[in-house]
């Protein structure tokens, strides 16, 4: 069943085929959606274009969008308005922190490192939502990705955990602001997946092993599981869901 037939979504944050953003894109494509991709910097452009070309039947718009640059962000959504008109949602899959700030103790986080992580990983959702609102004239859903480290202390997550906590709070406030426009805002808290970002988290293999040994489902999370949950949140099946943080982590978050 093509739950998203005739709808258009922007997917932000694809880096390579292991990206959670790419898993979301594939699931949206399989559900009948039309996709627009953004990339940050020329280094990622080729990857994004090559991946977009693998989606059969899609002629995806691929646009530059550095979320730390207000002018480029505005220009991106203005181009979307000119080329497409209306969109029905955004998958915000963007986060970054300096690797050095993911080591050692959080108390030693640098001021610049803290602000960088907050700017890219948390504030960017608000900046994106402000621009997306202008082209989401039929309502829809804005989705972001978070992790358990935003709710509790996870070793080696440090400054990113604090940024994710900020992101999760932003989801609630944005949901309150944008609900009157028919726009829902939600987050998926995905379990650990081997992505480019995960390489920066120390002892990542140990985290995966613990999930496999202790999570109720006794397995790690897949791109497809996150992507299919995104389809639900973007579809009318979730029309009454906003301000939520849905865990897709084999149940690991319920453990004490």
Swiss-Prot record:
Residues that hold substrate according to the record: 97
Biological processes annotated in GO: fatty acid elongation
Site (Involved in acyl-ACP binding): 205
Entry keyword Nucleotide-binding: yes
A Pfam family: adh_short_C2
Record's GO cellular component terms: catalytic complex
EC number: 1.3.1.9
Keywords noted in UniProt: Fatty acid biosynthesis, Fatty acid metabolism, Lipid biosynthesis, Lipid metabolism, NAD, NADP, Nucleotide-binding, Oxidoreductase
Active site: 147, 157
Pathway info: Lipid metabolism; fatty acid biosynthesis
GO molecular function, one term: enoyl-[acyl-carrier-protein] reductase (NADH) activity
UniProt catalytic activity: a 2,3-saturated acyl-[ACP] + NAD(+) = a (2E)-enoyl-[ACP] + NADH + H(+)
Transmembrane region(s): none
Protein family (similarity comment): Belongs to the short-chain dehydrogenases/reductases (SDR) family. FabI subfamily.
Name under which the protein is recorded: Enoyl-[acyl-carrier-protein] reductase [NADH] FabI
Organism of origin: Bacillus cereus (strain ATCC 14579 / DSM 31 / CCUG 7414 / JCM 2152 / NBRC 15305 / NCIMB 9373 / NCTC 2599 / NRRL B-3711)
